[in-house]
Amino acid sequence: MQKFRVYGQSRLRGSVNISGAKNAALPILFAAILAQEPVKLTNVPELKDIETTLKILRKLGVVVERDAEGAVHLDASKIDHFVAPYELVKTMRASIWALAPLVARFHRGQVSLPGGCSIGARPVDLHISGLERLGASIILEDGYVKAYVDHCLVGTRIVMEKVSVGATLSIMMAATLAKGKTIIENAAREPEITDTALFLNKMGAKIVGAGTDTITVEGVERLGGCEHSIVPDRIETGTFLVAAAISGGRIECKNTKADTLDAVIDKLREAGAQVDVTENSITLDMLGNRPRAVNIRTAPYPGFPTDMQAQFTLLNMVACGTSIITETIFENRFMHIPELIRMGGKAEIEGNTAICHGVDHLSGAEVMATDLRASISLVLAGCIATGETIVDRIYHIDRGYERIEEKLRGLGARIERFSAQSEES
């Protein structure tokens, strides 16, 4: 088991190149199953979840290669297997995205009920009901979601009972090869959905309205190959901006897009940060000041992203004043708070609300990561705390942040990865 050792009291300064968005790369990789010709993807981050996805695709018969420049080449023309097995799926909830393209193109598919972060219920019901509305028959059996359709999926009007990024993507992918028109209402609007739709359209799909709450898909007979660059990771961008804010530093995030982060930038400015944006960069300068507390309420895009909640919880714990954080997207997503309290933070949890009281400083401690975004908040806390912080279970971080210790060291952090076994010996 690997851990991070972080030495604190670092003021983070410099520039950092933002990686491609994991939350766009994953559905796009699975969407490549739909293509009957080769696909080339660039700006694909090197992450555990990406590695798992590529293993699943290889298991299905997709020819996968990552070249010397980091581009991923996919050839799904000879898929001969239609089951995403438990041993691969168990670590990653996003693997449910394999089902829709398999059913759409091959009229059958099986995916083991998935695993992933421990942040409450993320049921696959909306994925299943969407496929059923398109004409698929679904059986839950032996721990697998099994789907099939006699001829082809048929377009229809689907009103999402709740806004769901994952289900919107599944339905959109499936509808590309369905007969007729599919209209998805109350669709999620995240930039990653827009990027996936752009990729599908490059392959020959007919999708309009991605990025709005109504997406229309006119089914086509086949999809071909294309080249596509994954959109920059807005959550990684936001994470480094928070790192500058809590450390009184200045960080320029390069190769990113400010127009996907309006809600986050607004809150950082409210906290007292100076934020400057260009077409491809965002720079935050805290001017050596301590941030002001800001209230946060997570919401579907374009609202405040739930994936930035843990980072802003940390910001509020070292800010001037008291703040209220309300989590409306996922249950059980405050597991980082007890760990931050171990470091001297002050907060109370009441249902889906946390009340944070800013303190002058945090103190290093041994803490345990519980999910991807919680884990990065603990690492950043270690960067600014007094003393030494040990962060356990950092495999969560490797699922979603590319070369995180290298990037943090480039900004002045003192952080090292070590094996628990070597420490004990």
Swiss-Prot record:
UDP-N-acetyl-alpha-D-glucosamine binds at R93, R122, P123, V124, D125, L126, K162, V163, S164, V165, D307, I329. Its main location: cytoplasm. The lineage of its organism: Bacteria, Pseudomonadati, Pseudomonadota, Gammaproteobacteria, Pasteurellales. It is an enzyme of class 2 (transferase). GO terms for cellular component: cytoplasm. GO terms for biological process: cell division; cell wall organization; peptidoglycan biosynthetic process; regulation of cell shape; UDP-N-acetylgalactosamine biosynthetic process. This is UDP-N-acetylglucosamine 1-carboxyvinyltransferase. Cell wall formation. Adds enolpyruvyl to UDP-N-acetylglucosamine.
